[in-house]
Amino acid sequence: MDAQHEVRTADGVLSPRGESRPVHRGLIFAIVALALLMMSIDATIVATALHALRRDLQTSIDWAGWTITAYSLGFVVILPVTGKLSEQYGCRRVFLGSVAAFTAASLCCGLADNIYVLIVLRGLQAAGGAGFTPAATEIIVDHFGNARDRAVGLFGSIFAIGTMIGPIFGGLFVAYWTWRGIFLVNVPLGIAVIVLALCYVPRDRSRIGGNRQRMDAAGMALLGGGLLSGMLAVSHLAERNAHAWSPAFVIPLAIAIAALWMFFRHINRSSYPFIAPHLISGPGFGTVNLINALYGGITSGAVALVPLYASNRYGIDALGSGTLLVAQGAAAIVFSFAGAFALRRTGYRRPMYAGGVVIVAGMLLLALGPLAAIPPYAWLAGSAFLVGAGRGANNPASRNAGLQLAPEHASTLAALRTMCMSIGTIVTISIDTAILAGSHDPGRTQAWLFAAAAALLVAALPLIARVPEHRGSW
């Protein structure tokens, strides 16, 4: 057996090419899935606790909303760093460190006594959670052998479950306990993940430490500063009375443009770039990253505003409008699961085309409104279901696309994918809410925004022809 490709599994048995025994694959997947579920729940769980935060911490609803913004900003900025750290220091180490940081920050969030401390801690919590996806992807690639394509594809179901049940759990904690419970519940879960990972996730391969490169601190600073400034700029648009010519928008946007220009200039000249340029914009990779940003903006960004649309245009109450996203989440779960197991037969492009067409149909139906005697709630739920089905069909393919070209960069590619989708989501929500804030008829305006999103996706569908195609396992 080639020593370079040996790895010791949790029971001490060597397996070729980093492949764990089937019984341990299930345990490993369950461990990383629990971490991903915990992180994805926390992305949405705070939404239903904002009024409780405002009351108990004696603050405004705007400041309470920054607990969500801080999580989004911290997550996006730290993602590429954790991807690189997984490559340099090992995915198991980064996974354990990320879970420990997330758990500690969650405990501190639950004990916070003012809104300003809570906002900072939410950013730190997100920084810990940002390491979950890159490290988990690398763990799957390293230890699942020929089953890794399906395991990575199933991640989409986990995220859909988390984002769907997050607001429900948040409401239950606020109603029957306290808002602090939405953070404190992560402590026993995080400890359980750490203990299980120490016992069952195989150690990182020794070759990682031997090929460690010098970390590109300048590249990390430029990308982090550019992303943070850019996200602050677009987040400002979502605030009340915000204007595109306001210094609070123009200054951070200018800083973001300058920092990102310097970042790309730097990595093209550096001997040890923070992220290899071809992984961002090279053949195949650049197309996948652009598509992920567009899909994230539409399926996570625009669709997140469906409850607001239901209320503004059709007068549906808060409970009814909130449950509309359950239809979208349920469809995403089912079709992500099915798509992960069909991927070897379909390849990447066919489900991405099919998913895109179904998403377009769902968005157009949302914009059009109910026909004949169909109740508005049923129409909106059916439309949201279609968007979720398209999202689910696309997820396994878009998660795997490109990975087989550079499996040694699996953690960085996973970080780039999640970062692109998150940026698309934040930008879309910020722009849409800014437009709606200045509208005299927000319901009808939002319908046009849904139609515009559908048109944008139609224009982007030809890009799928440039996605690297692959059938079978890799």
Feature-to-residue mapping (PLM):
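Hydrophobic, well-ordered secondary-structure segments
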Residues: 1, 170, 185, 218, ...
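Cytoplasmic-side transmembrane-helix entry/capping segments in multi-pass membrane proteins
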Residues: 148-158, 212-221, 280, 349-356
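Residue-level signal for the membrane-embedded core of alpha-helical transmembrane segments
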Residues: 131, 225-228, 301, 393
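Hydrophobic transmembrane-helix bundles of small-molecule transporters
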Residues: 176-291, 298, 453
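Transmembrane helix-loop junctions and nearby membrane-interface residues
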Residues: 110-117, 198-204, 234-240, 264-267, ...
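Hydrophobic alpha-helical membrane-insertion segments
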Residues: 49-53, 78, 187, 195, ...
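Transmembrane-helix bundle of Major Facilitator Superfamily
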Residues: 2-200, 357-360, 364-367, 380, ...
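12-transmembrane solute porter fold
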Residues: 24-50, 57, 61-70, 74, ...
